[in-house]
Structures are given as C-alpha cells and as structure tokens.
Amino acid sequence: MDEVLFYVSAGDQSDTKKPAESFAYISSIHSSKQYETFRHAASPLNGTAISGVGLGERIFTSDNKKALVNVYTYGKESIDQRIPIPEALTALHIIHHPTLPHGAEAKGEEFENSLATHDKPNYRVPWLLCGGSKLGKLYIWELASGDLLCVKEAHYQGITRIDLSLCGTFLVTGGEDARIMVWNLADLIAIYGQAGLINETDSSSTVNRSGKPYYSITDNTLPITDFTLNQVGNLADLKLYTASKDSTVRIYDITTKQQLTTFILPQPVTCLARDPANRQLYAGLANGLIKTIPLYKFNQHTSVLEAVGGLDRIITVDQEDPNMLSTFVQHENHKVTKLCVSMDGTNLISGDDAGQVFVSDIATKQTIKSFPSLNFPISDLYVETVPVDLLVNDKIRTDKKHRMMPPLKRVLASADPVDHVLFMDIPQESVNTIISTKVHKDLDWLEKKKMEELLFKNLSDVNSTVKTIDTGANGGHNQQSTANLELKLSKVSEAYTDLRSKHEQLIKEHAKLLDKLAEGK
C-alpha cells in the first residue's frame, strides 16, 4: 500500500495569448516516487473532482476562462475529453453510486458495512457531477447519460465549494454571499415519476423543481472560503465545520440546525482541514500560518478529556504561540490555499498561492517532504491510499475498453421516466462472492462473540472465567482421588477434635488453679 497525493494548480491567470503551461501530478507522500503527470491541468479553487486513483478512474477540471469541463483518465497524460457546459464553473464535486449488495436494503444494513458482490467494470463513471457557477447556480448532471437533473439558483454570488455527507443525504454548498446552504440530495434530483409534479396540460411535461434548502446558514459576514463534514454514517452525529474570510471557524449540528461553537482567529481563514478522528481542526490563514484548533481538551481537575465549546460558545484562538505548539510556519508570507490530512492523521499536506506543497509532521510541526512547485496557486489536493500494484499496472496503458463519456446536456431532463436512457457496463458477479460472504459472516460472528465476552467480564477486575472439570475417560481415577481426599479430611477432622478437647481440659485446669490461688490470699 502507498498513500498518494494528487495536486493541481489554478494555472496562468494572465490574458496572454500563450499562457504558461500548467501540470498536475500524482505522487507518493512517503517516498520520492511520482506516478502520473497530467499536462495542461488547471482549475479554479475547488474546481477539480477526482473519482479515484487507478485503472478506469477519471479527473474532472473546470476551465478557468471557458465554459468547459476537461476530463482526464488515469494513465493518459493529455486531456481525454473537453465537454461544453452552459457556463463556466467555479466548483466541482462528484458523487459515486450507492454500493448496496443484494438484500442489504431489506436488512437495513449500513452502506459502509455492505459487501460488494461485483467487480468494478472497466468502463465506469461516477453517478453525479455537481458544479457551481460564478452566478451562484448549482448544476447536477447524471454522468452515465449526460442528463441535466437540476439547475438551482443556490446563491446570490459565486459558489466556492460543494461537498456531500458520507451518508449521501445532504449536499452542502458555500458561496461568496457568505451563506452556506444544506440541500437534501434526493429532493434536488427526484424528477422521475413524481406524482403531482407533471403538468398534464403542458405537452412538454415540465416539472416544478422549486426545492427549498434543508438548512440555510447566514451567520457569516464575509465570503465562505472552505468547509468540511465529519465522515460519519449516522445523521445524529453529522457536524459541519466552516471557514470564512471574517476570521471565524464555526461548527454546526446538521440534524438539530444549531450552531455549536465559534472560533475567532487572528487572520482571515482561507482553508480548513479536519483530523480523521475528529480530534482537531487545521485552519490555513491569509498570512501563511496554519493554526491547530483542538476539539477536545484535558481537564486537569477531573482528569477527563472534555469537548471544547458547545452551546453556541465563542472561543478566541490565541495569536501568541512562542513555542509553536499549535502553529505551522512552512508557508509564511504566502497565503495557504488548500489543506488535507493523511489517513492516519500524522501528516498535514498544505499548498499555497506560490504553488508550493509541503508534507508536515503534525506532532513535531516539521516539514518532512516538499513537492516540485507548480508556480501557480494550488487549487486542489486529494489524498488516497491504494495498492502499489494498482499504481504501476501495465493494463492502465492498454485499456482497450475505454469509452468516452456522453456530452453534458444544457436543458433539464424530461420528467417522463420513459425518456431516461442509461448505458452502463454491468460486470459479471465476482467469483469470490460466496467465499467473501462466508468470511464476512465469520468475521461478524467473531465480532459478536468478542462483544459478548466484553459484556460478560463487565470491564471489572473480577475474573469471570468459568472453569470446567473433565468427566470423560478419567472418571474412575477422579473417583479414587475423591475417596482419598475424603479419607484425609476425616483424619484431619478427628485430630482437630482431639486437640480441641485437650485444649478445653487445660483451660478448665488453669481456671481451677487460679481459684485456689485466690482463696489462699
């Protein structure tokens, strides 16, 4: 396994006829290995979406100046497709297909615990492509068909970032109008077979798609620069962390629609990253510093790890940090544009407006690796852990089954499900499905027994192990041993009784002697 980083820049923003060439790379963060290079790759901040790393995966970048989406395929250096769209986009995000195996829906199992029963097809595309424009419009396309499922006036100004919750329920957008909108994804794309939405008097069967946001956040005063969601499958624990140019980082509970905590920082916050274990946040500032915001704090009086903030508290992050215990200074004098954290939470990857990308050790705050500079502001970072053989597979270079994506349509899709034509490559069922399912069930059984043992021991110092006595072939020997033990016990009892009687007799004689001495006096 290797942990790789995809990084891309915003490219040359000048109006020259021949702008400087820009690149994007996929490199290891633990070694000097560079796996892939993509030429002419550039996008605005948060304007890149990557489906993954390996055979059949794609990279989508929005053009800085034109209404185009450039598509790259893994293993090919140049642009694979240029897809025209209604207007230039400033933010992109892809949504993958739900991965539910047979019977998982009926059993009510969580999707992250489900077991895939089919291999990945050679030709595959993500499920949806979401894009935000400079005018604040939200576009959602179905990539397999190219249908435009949604066009929404989501913000008054340009959209800066789009993201989806891990459970796939909520789509979150942030904009330059200082607002964050939380949408129900099902409401945005549910256009097929909706009773009461089709206008029977209209021959074109137009649909009323005026869906309202689930939650509208208007607490900020300056544009939203970044936000992140904690990766939980349970909606009750879903939290939203936002960053803004008004120098604040805010935490919201999506389910209760309440603001939990506000952190005030000394400089405008340009980007935000979250620890995989939700232990702390990392805020990139406009002056090049990266501040660590702990979400838990050790209470010295009670010796308990307590959550920081809550109940709409306002906490000021101290600007003075002479010992650099909570500050990264690798990008000093350069605005930090993107942040991300490694899988194990030990390394922080950061990029700035000078095109520099560093990997820093979170514990020591030291730089452990630097990547070749892209000379333009870093617009996106993506970290993934993949097998090494997948990165250097020769099949990537000779993928004959690769097909082009359909063009993205400019008009909304019809509400009639008959008009919905979808082409997908469905592979055969995996040969190891039965074996994998059996192994999966065995692991579930072992996990169940482990929890039962934990509950039985009750987390105490009492040893609850039940000892068993073998009553098999050695039954006769055990009976003889029992008889010998009973004989010894009877002898000990007789000796004890004799000793006790002698002791009582001596006590009586001693009492008589004391009485005689008393009478003599």
From Swiss-Prot:
WD repeats lie at residues 106-151, 154-193, 219-262, 321-361. Gene3D superfamilies: YVTN repeat-like/Quinoprotein amine dehydrogenase. The keyword Repeat applies. It is found in: Nucleus. Belongs to the WD repeat IPI3/WDR18 family. Component of the RIX1 complex required for processing of ITS2 sequences from 35S pre-rRNA. This is Pre-rRNA-processing protein IPI3.
